[in-house]
Amino acid sequence: MSSLIKLRRQPKADEKPKASLRILLISPSYAPSRNTMYFPIGLSYVAAYVRKFGYEVVPLNMNHWDAEERYQQLERVLREERIDVVGITGITIAFNEIERIIQFVRPRSQAQIVLGGGITSCESELVLSTLKPDYMVVSEGELIFLNLLQTMESGGDPGDVRGIWYFKDGKPCSTGEGDGIGNLDDLPQPDLDLFGMEEHLAIQCEQQFSYHESHLVGSKMIPITASRSCPFRCTFCYHAGMGKYRRHSIVATVEHIKACIEKFGVRYFMIYDELFSANKARLIEFCDLVKDLSIRWYCQLRVDQMDQLLLHRMKAAGCHYISYGFESGSDTVLESMQKKITAAQIAKAVKMTREARIGIQANFLFGDIVETEQTLQETLAFQQANELFFVDWSAVIPYPGTQLFDRAIERNQIPDRDLFIRSMGNVSNYLWKHMINLTDLPDARFRELYVELRELNDQNHRKVRTIVEAGEALGPTRSTMTFRCPTCDHVDTGAVIPYPPECTQGGAPNLKSPIGIPGMNVVCPDCMRKHHLVAKAIPHVGQIYAEFQRSLDALKASQKEVVVLPAVDRFYGVVFEDLDLSGLKVAAVLDTREHRIGASFLGQTTIKLDQTSAAQQVGRAAIVLPWVEYDTAVATLLAAGFAREDIVCWNEYFAAAMLGDDAAQERKPGHEPRVGFGAPLPETFSPSKAWARTEPNKALVRSS
C-alpha cells in the first residue's frame, strides 16, 4: 500500500524558485469533435503543483479542437516551443489516441515522454511495453511527477523515484508504489485557466442539445472535484491508482467555487467526484455554505444516504440534478455487484428525489456474472413500476483493474489483452462487435437481449412524449416549437430546436449515422423530468419524413419489386412506427453485418450484400433504410448495375435536405439524391426555398 504523506512546504511567491525543464502537458480527447463533456481537472492539479516549484508548463487541451486540428496544434507547439518533457494523461479508453500522440511526438521532439492517469495503473507492464513512453507515473501525479522531474533535472537515478515504471536495460521496471497525498487541502487550486476554461465555457453552447439530454436554456458549467476515489468497491468499477478515499474540506471546496464565480462569472457547477459525499453531515454543511451563492449544481450520490428533508435542503441550495448508481432492479444482481444497496432503497430514493423536483441521472447495466433471464425480468418490472423510462440500458464492461476483468481473464475470454484494450478505444464499437459475455447465457441469446434492451430505451422514451402544440421550420436544420411537459404541464414557447443536435451552432449534420431516427430527450426546466421529442414531430425533420414516405408510397403503387437494406435491428421499433413499410413488394433483404445474415426481415431471409448478390437484384428498386454504412451500400449497388433513379436512400434524403442538392452531390460523386421514386428533388423540398409552417402533430398532442 502506498503511504499518505503531508505535502512538502511549497515555495512562497517571493522565493522565485528556478527550474530548467519546460513541460508540455497534453490532455487527449475522447471524442472526434470538440468536446465539452470532459475537462482535464487532474492535469490542472498537476500543473498547478509543479508550477509552484518553478517548472514552466505549456498546456495542450486537445478537447478544444476537432480530430485533425488537434495534431496541427501539437505540431505547432513542438515546432515553436522548447519542450524538455512531454506529459500525457488518460484512461484506458484513450489507449489508441495516446499511442498516436506518442508516435506523433517521437520524430518531432527529443523530449522525454511521461505517461500518467488511470491508464498506467492497470496492465502497467503491457501499457509501457506497447505505448513506449520513457516513464509512467502510477497513482496520483502531483508528488510522483514532481519527484521524477527533479530527478531528471539533477541527472539522478530514476530507480530512486517511487511510483513509476521505466525501461531499465531495455526491460520494463517498476519502482513500487509511490506516496499519496494525505490532505487534499494542501494542494493548490487546479489551474483551470492554463487548460483553457474560458474556451471550454465558450464552446459548451455547441453541446447544449443532444439526443440523450437537451436543455432549452443553456448554462455554462464548471467542473470541480471535492474528493478522490471512492470508499466502495463495486465489481464493475475501476479505482486502481486512486488510493484511499479522501476529501477536500467543504470550506475549501466552497472557496474554490467562490473563486470560479469571481473569475469566470459562472454559477453552475458539476461536481466530478465518483461520490460527492459518503455522509449526510458533509452534504448539509455544503448546502449551508452555498445556499446564498445563487448557484446550481450537479453531483453523484448513493441512494441509501438520502431522505426527504435532505433532498429539499439540497434543492433549496441549488442542487438540480443527482446522478445515482442504480445498475439493476434485482437484489440478486445488486448483491453480486457489491453495490451494498437494495432495489427498495432505489425506489424510495427515486420517489423522494422527484418529490424534491431534482433531476435524476442513472443507468441500468446488463450482463453481470449472475445475470439471468429471471434477474433481467426483475429489473424490467422494477423499471416500469417506477416509471424509470429515461434510465437507459447499457452493458457491463470488464475494464482493466475491475473484478470483472479478472473474471474474464480466468475464463479465458480475453486471449489478447492488447487487442482487448484497443477495442475499448471506441466503446460503441466494442459494445456492438467485441462485447464479452460474462454471464452463463448463450452468446447468441446474450447479444439478442442486449439489442432488445437498446431498443427498449427508445420505446421507453416514447412513453413520455413531448406534447407538441405548434411548430415552424426555420430552415434545413432547425425549427421553432411550442410544447408542453407531459409531467408538470410547464409550457415552453418559441423554443428553437436544432436537429440533428450537432447542428446546434451551425455544425454539419453527421450523415454517417442513423440520422433522423433518434429523438431528443428534453429536460423540463421546472420539474427537471425528461420528455421525449420524437424526431418526426420536429417540423423540418417531419418534412423529410413526408418526402421519403411519398417515395415509398410511389413504389407501392407501382408494384415494382424492391430490395431492402439493411435488416434493421437497432432502431427497429422507431423505423416501423414512424415509416409505413407495409404494402411494399419486398423480394430480397441485403446486409453486410454478419450477425444479421440469415435473419428474417420483412418476410425475407437476409443475405449478405456484396457485388454478386447486388447484381442479382438489378432491375428492382432498392430502399436503403437509415444506416451508418449507407454510402458503402449505395456504392455497391451502383457498381453492380443499379440505375441511380432506382435507389431510394434515407441518409441521402437528409443530405439533400440539410446540405442542398449541390452539397449532397459533392459528398457523393456520381450520386443524384432523389425524392420520390424516379423523380428529381421537388422545388418545394429545396432548402433554398421558404420553409412552410407545419400544423401541430395531432398524434402527439394530448387530448384534453
Q: Where in the sequence are the language-model features?
A:
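Hydrophobic, well-ordered beta-alpha structural blocks that scaffold small-molecule cofactor pockets
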Residues: 487-489, 524-704
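Glycine- and acidic-residue-enriched helix-capping/strand-helix junction motifs
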Residues: 33-43
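Radical SAM [4Fe-4S] cluster-binding motif and immediate context
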Residues: 191-360, 494-505, 511, 518-522
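Conserved C-terminal portion of the radical SAM core fold
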Residues: 66, 85-89, 114, 261-272, ...
